[in-house]
Regions:
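Accessory nucleic acid-recognition modules appended to NTPase machines
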Residues: 12-152
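Catalytic cores of nucleic-acid endonucleases
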Residues: 153-155, 168-207
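Short secondary-structure boundary/capping segments
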Residues: 5, 105-106, 175
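Amphipathic alpha-helical segments of the small helical/lid subdomains adjacent to P-loop NTPase cores
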Residues: 1-11
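Structural signal for conserved beta-strand scaffold positions within catalytic alpha/beta enzyme cores
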Residues: 97, 116, 166, 185-187
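Short, basic/low-complexity N-terminal boundary segments at the transition from targeting/disordered tails
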Residues: 131-145, 164, 185, 196-199, ...
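Conserved catalytic cores of phosphodiester-cleaving nucleases, focusing on short active-site segments
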Residues: 144, 158-173
């Protein structure tokens, strides 16, 4: 568990053991938002700055439940472009969008929540908002979406196929998954699982 806590803060990136890790991570963020994405998407400099502003707004309120028009007004862009901007930021590995199961024209459901891509980014960008609940959900989604189709759950945190997952601490109860067809409680701060209870750290071992 101490090693897991260490990973949460600075274990995701290959340069995590560097003494200048925080400086390097912030350089990666700035390079990605201000140069890489604008060049890839053929954006001008001012639009690149708006992307950075958008990321900071998300970082301060994760898990972020987007109201697209309000968000577009804040950063001064057309609502029509906002979904594309978010998709660029997601593809660049800065955020992760959790969608519902409604599908749509692009084959993507409605975005229900936006997380930072991994827990290290929470410490780099939103340290003052690094609440433990958000940390747990971010880690679970970061690890499971690699090989699974993870969507938002109507009764809990996440849905993978017929399985429902509620994320919490060691005292988390079963109430929210009581009506789930196949429900699991994912608990932080425990080393071993039992019944339908699975330790959070276990999800870091699935690929």
């Amino acid at each position: 568990l101490p090693l897991f806590a260490e990973y949460i803060q600075h274990g995701y990136y290959p340069f995590s053991k560097d003494t200048t890790f925080e400086i390097e991570l912030n350089q990666v963020i700035n390079q990605t938002m201000e140069n890489d994405i604008p060049q890839y998407a053929n954006m001008n400099v001012s639009t690149g700055r708006k992307l950075k502003q958008l990321l900071m707004i998300i970082a301060k309120s994760v898990p972020f439940k987007p109201v697209m028009q309000k968000l577009a007004d804040i950063i001064g862009v057309s609502r029509n472009y906002l979904s594309d901007y978010l998709l660029y930021i997601e593809k660049a590995g800065m955020i992760a969008q959790v969608r519902d199961d409604t599908g749509g024209i692009r084959g993507l459901g409605k975005v229900e929540k936006i997380y930072l891509d991994n827990t290290n980014l929470i410490y780099a960008l939103g340290r003052e908002n690094s609440n433990i609940g958000n940390m747990r959900e971010t880690f679970f989604y970061n690890q499971m979406r690699v090989k699974q189709d993870v969507i938002s759950s109507k009764i809990s945190d996440f849905q993978i196929g017929e399985r429902t997952f509620e994320i919490g601490g060691k005292n988390k109860g079963q109430q929210q998954i009581a009506k789930a067809q196949e429900g699991y409680i994912v608990k932080d701060d425990i080393e071993t699982g039992y019944g339908n209870i699975i330790p959070l750290w276990n999800f870091g071992m699935n690929y």
